[in-house]
Amino acid sequence: MMNQNVQGQGNVIKETTNKVFIVGALVKNGLEVINEGEENEAIRGSLTLRTEDGSEHDVQYYANRYKKSNGSFTNELNPQFDTLLAAKEDFIDMSNEYGEPATVIKIGGGSFRANDYMSKNTGALVSTFRINASFANKLEGKDLELNPQLAKYEVSGIITKIEPEMKNIRI
């Protein structure tokens, strides 16, 4: 993402670069097909990839079956849905029962995203980051040799304002 302004709690951050590149062996395939209302089928979930250094990276995906236009679904199929459906059905993870080697995957369109939510246990705001991506491509043959299994993150931005955190203040 280029030059996106992100605002939150008094801070303004100008995001200038947000790119994630990962090539790794599939540890866990957590993609699932779901029905969202009567109109839409979607695929969501994650692929967990392990790079050569042993680190694991959880990559989140979501795609509707049909494209949207002006907030409504069209009859046009979303190619991202088909790509992820093929990944769900065809990619082999490390826990497969046949002992086959895990599929090596290269993610496409990856980026960091804020993941903020209220904790059900404490009621406190939890702020984390997660990796979202658009595509997952299976690497085979010569592509395996040309793409080392590693994770590369390119994230930069400009913080224009920081305010002190105020917690549990009673007025």
Across the structure, where does each feature detected by a protein language model lie?
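OB-fold and OB-like single-stranded nucleic-acid-recognition modules
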Residues: 1-171
